């Protein structure tokens, strides 16, 4: 095994990464730097510092990345109306590039020659992290313990922790019926009780949203203001990106918005069942399409829709730092220059309904032309005959030749 001098570990302080930290020290005999990112997972992260100190870690990085996460990753993704396989809003996928970037930057700052993560050898996250590492520092050494060790179950992890004297809180020992991951965009649930795709999840599983059945009986209206494709104000109050998403999560959760139960195709080849809560993101997606509907040229909007599945797959599969994703982002961002205005939505029992949209500066909606009433000659209906005949020409020729 090649000698590793120092490794930067993505460290949550939970069971898995606590075991990994000790395993790295024992197996590689290397110095470990811990990096803990606050991306809105809603958990106390300072205990990770205390645990790292217990392991004798001298270089401990704990960073609040919530604003950067939403501003530089979530918002750019939503400019494309991104959905994977028609349903998934990519809450886990979009968080990995930022974590990978900071790990590499910390490695460069501290002189580390390796990085390590706690993703399993079965999932997509190992790919997402490592594609990011290699894209940002091609010669970095990657240590993926789940692909090396024989600790293949939770029970084995707990046994190892006990033997090594690794402090594990009672709630970590008790575990959860699900494997969960959270950030400001979503919370996900996988594995264990969800491995039967035919079984309905228990209501107690959902943490961010109330059931639509028990949501308030009165609707709630929201006004969202857009500048260059991004939300900048909510109900007239200008807020930071992270504050906007936090507030939308609260409002969406209150009205039972954003629950999803799906089977997705993982990049590594298997199908996986997952449940997600993305209340704020669900509102954002619906509202963004609404503001685009009056500010984007038809062909630009259709081109974006054509490119979106490819863009979504790049993010899902871990290619955020690839040249093709960056190229698509330039195109997407250029399309948003005139996406300015206001959208009004109604939240009611799991539904997000667009009830109004306007743009004082960039609307392409012309009421004089679109009206069903007298238009004063703005649109000459007789002109449509030639348009229709020319577009029908190829079909008329084919019919004459009995090809259709």
UniProtKB/Swiss-Prot annotation:
<feature type="binding site">
    <location>
        <position position="179"/>
    </location>
    <ligand>
        <name>L-citrulline</name>
    </ligand>
</feature>
<feature type="binding site">
    <location>
        <position position="125"/>
    </location>
    <ligand>
        <name>L-aspartate</name>
    </ligand>
</feature>
<protein>
    <recommendedName>
        <fullName>Argininosuccinate synthase</fullName>
        <ecNumber>6.3.4.5</ecNumber>
    </recommendedName>
</protein>
<feature type="binding site">
    <location>
        <position position="88"/>
    </location>
    <ligand>
        <name>L-citrulline</name>
    </ligand>
</feature>
<dbReference type="InterPro" id="IPR023434">
    <property type="entry name" value="Arginosuc_synth_type_1_subfam"/>
</dbReference>
<dbReference type="InterPro" id="IPR048268">
    <property type="entry name" value="Arginosuc_syn_C"/>
</dbReference>
<dbReference type="InterPro" id="IPR048267">
    <property type="entry name" value="Arginosuc_syn_N"/>
</dbReference>
<comment type="pathway">
    <text>Amino-acid biosynthesis; L-arginine biosynthesis; L-arginine from L-ornithine and carbamoyl phosphate: step 2/3.</text>
</comment>
<feature type="binding site">
    <location>
        <position position="264"/>
    </location>
    <ligand>
        <name>L-citrulline</name>
    </ligand>
</feature>
<keyword id="KW-0963">Cytoplasm</keyword>
<dbReference type="Pfam" id="PF20979">
    <property type="entry name" value="Arginosuc_syn_C"/>
</dbReference>
<feature type="binding site">
    <location>
        <begin position="10"/>
        <end position="18"/>
    </location>
    <ligand>
        <name>ATP</name>
    </ligand>
</feature>
<keyword id="KW-0547">Nucleotide-binding</keyword>
<feature type="binding site">
    <location>
        <position position="93"/>
    </location>
    <ligand>
        <name>L-citrulline</name>
    </ligand>
</feature>
<feature type="binding site">
    <location>
        <position position="120"/>
    </location>
    <ligand>
        <name>L-aspartate</name>
    </ligand>
</feature>
<feature type="binding site">
    <location>
        <position position="124"/>
    </location>
    <ligand>
        <name>L-aspartate</name>
    </ligand>
</feature>
<dbReference type="GO" id="GO:0004055">
    <property type="term" value="F:argininosuccinate synthase activity"/>
</dbReference>
<dbReference type="InterPro" id="IPR024074">
    <property type="entry name" value="AS_cat/multimer_dom_body"/>
</dbReference>
<feature type="binding site">
    <location>
        <position position="124"/>
    </location>
    <ligand>
        <name>L-citrulline</name>
    </ligand>
</feature>
<keyword id="KW-0436">Ligase</keyword>
<keyword id="KW-0028">Amino-acid biosynthesis</keyword>
<feature type="binding site">
    <location>
        <position position="128"/>
    </location>
    <ligand>
        <name>L-citrulline</name>
    </ligand>
</feature>
<dbReference type="GO" id="GO:0006526">
    <property type="term" value="P:L-arginine biosynthetic process"/>
</dbReference>
<dbReference type="InterPro" id="IPR018223">
    <property type="entry name" value="Arginosuc_synth_CS"/>
</dbReference>
<dbReference type="InterPro" id="IPR014729">
    <property type="entry name" value="Rossmann-like_a/b/a_fold"/>
</dbReference>
<dbReference type="GO" id="GO:0005524">
    <property type="term" value="F:ATP binding"/>
</dbReference>
<dbReference type="GO" id="GO:0000053">
    <property type="term" value="P:argininosuccinate metabolic process"/>
</dbReference>
<comment type="subunit">
    <text>Homotetramer.</text>
</comment>
<feature type="binding site">
    <location>
        <position position="188"/>
    </location>
    <ligand>
        <name>L-citrulline</name>
    </ligand>
</feature>
<feature type="binding site">
    <location>
        <position position="118"/>
    </location>
    <ligand>
        <name>ATP</name>
    </ligand>
</feature>
<dbReference type="GO" id="GO:0000050">
    <property type="term" value="P:urea cycle"/>
</dbReference>
<dbReference type="GO" id="GO:0005737">
    <property type="term" value="C:cytoplasm"/>
</dbReference>
<dbReference type="Pfam" id="PF00764">
    <property type="entry name" value="Arginosuc_synth"/>
</dbReference>
<feature type="binding site">
    <location>
        <position position="37"/>
    </location>
    <ligand>
        <name>ATP</name>
    </ligand>
</feature>
<comment type="similarity">
    <text>Belongs to the argininosuccinate synthase family. Type 1 subfamily.</text>
</comment>
<keyword id="KW-0067">ATP-binding</keyword>
<keyword id="KW-0055">Arginine biosynthesis</keyword>
<dbReference type="InterPro" id="IPR001518">
    <property type="entry name" value="Arginosuc_synth"/>
</dbReference>
<feature type="binding site">
    <location>
        <position position="276"/>
    </location>
    <ligand>
        <name>L-citrulline</name>
    </ligand>
</feature>
């Amino acid at each position: 095994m090649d000698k590793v001098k120092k490794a930067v570990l993505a460290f949550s302080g939970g069971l898995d990464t606590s075991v990994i930290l000790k395993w790295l020290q024992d197996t590689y005999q290397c110095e470990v730097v811990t990096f803990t990112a606050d991306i809105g997972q809603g958990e106390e992260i300072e205990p990770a510092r205390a645990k790292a100190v217990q392991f004798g870690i001298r270089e401990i990085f704990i960073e609040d990345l919530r604003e950067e996460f939403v501003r530089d990753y979530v918002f750019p993704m939503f400019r494309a109306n991104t959905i994977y396989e028609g349903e998934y809003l990519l809450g886990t996928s979009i968080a990995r590039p930022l974590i990978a970037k900071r790990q590499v930057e910390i490695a460069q700052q501290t002189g580390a020659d390796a990085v390590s993560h706690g993703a399993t050898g079965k999932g997509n996250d190992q790919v997402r992290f490592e594609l990011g590492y290699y894209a940002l520092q091609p010669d970095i050494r990657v240590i993926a313990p789940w692909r090396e060790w024989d600790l293949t179950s939770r029970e084995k992890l707990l046994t190892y922790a006990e033997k090594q004297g690794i402090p594990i809180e009672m709630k970590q020992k008790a575990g959860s019926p699900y494997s969960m991951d959270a950030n400001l965009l979503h919370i996900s649930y996988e594995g264990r009780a969800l491995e039967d795709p035919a079984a309905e999840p228990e209501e107690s599983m959902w943490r961010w949203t109330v059931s639509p059945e028990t949501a308030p009986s009165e609707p709630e209206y929201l006004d969202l203001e857009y500048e260059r494709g991004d939300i900048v104000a909510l109900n007239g109050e200008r807020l930071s990106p992270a504050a906007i998403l936090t507030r939308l999560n609260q409002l969406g959760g209150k009205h039972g918005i954003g629950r999803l139960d799906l089977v997705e195709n993982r990049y590594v080849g298997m199908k996986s069942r997952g449940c997600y809560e993305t209340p704020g993101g669900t509102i954002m997606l619906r509202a963004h399409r609404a503001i685009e509907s009056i500010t984007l040229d038809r062909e630009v909007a259709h081109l974006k829709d054509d490119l979106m599945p490819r863009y979504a797959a790049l993010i899902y599969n871990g290619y955020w730092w690839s040249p093709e994703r960056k190229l698509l982002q330039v195109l997407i961002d250029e399309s948003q220059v005139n996406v300015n205005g206001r959208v009004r939505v109604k939240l009611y029992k799991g539904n997000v309904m667009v009830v109004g949209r306007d743009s004082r500066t960039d609307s392409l909606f012309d009421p004089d032309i679109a009206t069903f009433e007298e238009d004063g000659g703005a649109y000459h209906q007789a002109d449509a005959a030639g348009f229709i005949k020319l577009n029908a020409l190829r079909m008329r020729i084919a019919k004459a030749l009995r090809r259709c």
